[in-house]
Amino acid sequence: METNYVILLDYSSGEIIKIRLSDEEIQKSESYEDFEMFLSTIESKYNFRLKDCYWMSVEYLKERSYI
């Protein structure tokens, strides 16, 4: 499975952060043994703190909302 999207649940701010990784970011992420280490390199770019988030990575993004 190729990771194209990262979804973060920031429990300190109550935000859901959806990131579509660029081709360059996907390539860079593959050079890390641990995907979480890669995520720490993009914290400042996307303005989140990994220690305050739960995350998942997916190839395809699907959403449902019951609001």
Residue ranges: model-predicted function:
Residues 35-67:
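Short, mixed-charge low-complexity intrinsically disordered segments
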Residues 13-44:
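Short, flexible N-terminal segments of the mature chain
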Residues 1-4, 36:
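A short, compositionally biased
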